Design a protein with these regions (language model features):
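Acidic-aromatic substrate-binding/catalytic surfaces of carbohydrate-active enzymes
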Residues: 25-28, 96, 100-103, 426-543
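CE4/NodB-like, metal-dependent polysaccharide N-deacetylase domain
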Residues: 97-124, 199-210
Length: 712
């Protein structure tokens, strides 16, 4: 009798920059217990993928775990899979890096396990048709993605119990369709339900393919209790063992070598079903969700659903400009570095070592995991980008004092940017708002301006409609939830923090605010802006002045008061020295309208990552702050200097002005989804320096603001 081939594939990953205690928890709750249970059941032969961050972690902290893996590989119980070393979205990194990252992980597996992997895990299953050419160049013979990809190309469920061939430029690879049904059954439903699914294939030579995250076996909410303490995994393996007369567990590679393909297929650009929803614009995402729910209630819903597709992964770059800027900064530097074959440098001095880490996918997108919303993950990517850029520039500039300037549309948004560098820092200016988007302290590898804008997400309506279940009620839920079903909240009243910004939270943003000014309205971005300078383009001019580089921004705009529009002009110049971490900004405002009043404000957004940590705080010389945390809220008058101190990273951000100002300070906090539900996250400290202006025709106002970084 023909047996059902049960192909069980697990993918384990932790992002670059994740905290060590998070990795240790994942190891204790998922990676180690899974392998310990697997060892007890030699009948279970599976495929497994660990990303490079985990290989590094195991080598540094748990070499004994690697020894266990070697034993299972030698016994044929584990098939190791390769992939991009730092889990990049392969489709959006340079082709040489596609191959380079895969080969690096393959080499690591060869060195540690003594085998050469045939198969590859595709990060986030983000498929694009050009990939086979580069996968084959890297030595990959097969990959596994989702059956969703195949269904979008017209295939049915019954067509997906094996693998298909696809190619690009004649380079052929084998592609397995992982079952969506099994992905939702395992390990959230009783093992018997999975066996029932497999039994439908009984008597055939079909394959049932499970391929999903290993973190769902212990890390996802409540799964450690269900999978190990209640014994789901052992019961599942025992159940398979009792039915070996008609089920044959085997690694994907064994099946690929033994069985013929089901046919040829060409797959459209896609990821898994949920990712295609998350990548949609917010309003479209909400509508898409409603359509999918309606289809579930329709008798023909399943048939129609095959032909409905969501978004496209690359649109995260359109959805989140912060993600796009980081991605394009990495690409821009990669182009400068060029082909590794032309360079001979020690590994520790190779900028590609760091640039590859900056390609790690997690902080470039957001779904129900924290992703982009987690500041420490964004910081880790910038940290590696800054290190790579510093190594590259060190080789380009032998002198101690130098300054470089580039004018270009580096991020493809249709507007001009200026990248300005000296040995101590990197600055990124945007013509939009004449703003500063990035300020890198090279000595600390730290972008101090990495603040995320507060945006409406498709899932926020769950909070607004009060359909959030308290995490305290989780224990009363009989069935373990998948990560996609969780709408719990880490604290009550999070809907009160749902404020959305009308502009990007950059720095040196120019505000005109009418009297009476209201702090709360401004903090919530629910105030009335009189000027039109926040999002409109400024004209750019650059000049070299001795050892200083100057960047001039000019915009003639208008001030809307009492339905009248009066002309007003802002000229601001940024002066940067050749060997310091400071930028001096001089403003000149010229008013051409009728006599009146307004308040001119300069907004800066600074992110030192920890809003409530005692070692990160405000210090205002000569003033006592009852609450000096970076997440504190307050208003002060007659201020000329503000310090934001980071004792952990041993740096201090200093803000000075030559005219005493009023100061508002408040945290930028987002409400986003994570693995365990809704959470509030500190994204940065917002500071508004403002001055009341008596407007007169032809009148001018001048002020100088200096932003600098010092080491502690």
């Amino acid at each position: 009798m023909e047996k059902v081939a049960f192909l069980f594939c697990v993918h384990d990953h932790q992002p670059v920059g994740n905290f060590l205690h998070v990795l240790e928890n994942a190891y204790e709750k998922a990676y180690l217990p899974f392998i310990e249970v697997l060892k007890k059941y030699p009948l279970m032969k599976i495929s497994i993928h660990y990303t490079g961050t985990l290989w590094d972690f195991f080598k540094d902290h748990h070499p004994e775990f690697l020894e266990t893996l070697r034993e299972l590989v030698k016994k044929g119980q584990l098939e190791m899979m390769t992939g991009g070393y730092y889990e990049p979205i392969l489709a959006v990194i340079p082709d040489t890096d596609k191959v380079g990252q895969i080969k690096r992980l393959t080499q690591t597996i060869e060195e540690e396990m003594g085998v050469t992997p045939q198969g590859m895990w595709l990060a986030e299953r983000v498929w694009e048709p050009h990939l086979p050419k580069y996968l084959r160049e890297a030595g990959v013979e097969y990959i596994t993605i989702d059956d969703y990809h195949f269904k979008k190309s017209g295939l049915r469920e019954e067509d997906l119990h094996g693998y298909y061939l696809t190619e690009e430029d004649g380079k052929v690879i084998k592609v397995f369709p992982g079952s969506e049904t099994l992905r939702y059954l395992i390990p959230f439903h009783p093992p018997e339900e999975t066996l029932e699914y497999l039994s439908r294939l009984r008597g055939s030579s079909c394959a049932a393919i499970f391929a999903d995250d290993g973190e769902k076996f212990g890390i996802w909410p409540s799964t450690y209790h269900s999978v190990y303490e209640e014994g789901w995994l052992e019961r599942f393996f025992e159940l398979i063992g009792k039915n070996l007369d008609w089920i044959e567990p085997m690694p994907l590679g064994i099946y690929a070598n033994r069985e013929k393909p089901l046919g040829r297929i060409y797959l459209a650009c896609s990821s898994y079903m949920e990712m295609d929803e998350w990548s949609l614009p917010t309003e479209a995402m909400v509508e898409y969700g409603k359509v999918v729910e309606r289809l579930k209630e329709s008798s023909e819903g399943g048939q129609i659903r095959r032909f409905i597709k969501g978004g496209f992964w690359r649109n995260f770059f359109a959805k989140y400009p912060e993600s796009n800027d980081l991605h394009k900064r990495v690409l821009h530097l990669r182009e400068k570095i060029g082909d590794k074959k032309k360079r001979t440098v020690p590994k520790s001095q190779d900028p590609l070592l760091y640039l590859h880490q900056a390609q790690c996918n997690d902080a470039y997108w957001h779904g129900v995991f924290g992703g982009l919303y987690l500041p420490h993950l964004r910081h880790a990517l910038y940290e590696n980008l800054i290190k790579a850029e510093a190594l590259f520039d060190r080789k380009m500039h032998r002198e101690k004092e130098w300054i470089d300037l580039e004018r270009l549309d580096f991020n493809g948004d249709g507007d001009e940017e200026v990248i300005l560098k000296n040995p101590e820092m990197v600055l990124l200016f945007s013509s939009r708002g004449g703003s500063l988007l990035e300020m890198d302290d090279r000595s600390k590898a730290f972008n101090i301006l990495g603040t995320l804008t507060r945006r409406k997400e498709g899932y926020h309506h769950n909070l607004l409609e009060s359909r959030v279940q308290s995490s305290r009620d989780e224990a009363s839920t009989a069935k373990t939830k998948t990560i996609h079903e969780i709408f719990d909240s880490k604290e009550e009243g999070l809907d009160q923090y749902l404020y959305f910004d009308g502009y990007r939270r950059a720095s040196f943003l120019d505000h005109f605010i009418a009297e009476p000014m209201d702090f709360e309205s401004f903090r919530r971005c629910q105030y009335q802006e009189e000027g039109d300078f926040l999002k409109e383009p400024y004209e750019i001019e650059v000049r070299k002045k001795g050892k200083y580089q100057e960047v001039f921004f000019t915009r003639s705009g208008s001030l809307c008061k009492d339905e009248k529009r009066d002309q007003i002009k802002i000229e601001k110049s940024f002066s940067i020295p050749t060997h310091q971490r400071v930028v001096k900004t001089s403003y000149q405002i010229t008013y051409k309208g009728e006599k009146g009043k307004t308040n001119f404000g300069i907004e800066l957004n600074i992110n030192l990552l920890a809003g409530d940590a005692p070692d990160r705080y405000y210090n205002i010389p000569g003033r006592y702050l009852e609450d000096r945390k970076l997440a504190s809220i307050g208003a002060l008058n007659d201020i000329t200097e503000v310090h934001l101190v980071d004792e952990w990273n041993k740096l201090k951000v200093i803000l000075k002005t030559d005219k005493s100002c009023n100061l508002w300070r408040f945290p930028i906090e987002t409400v986003s989804l994570s693995e365990s539900g809704f959470e509030r996250i500190f994204q940065g400290s917002s500071l508004l320096l403002y001055w009341p202006l008596e407007l007169e025709t032809g009148g001018q106002f001048e002020v100088t603001v200096e932003l600098g970084i010092q080491s502690l």
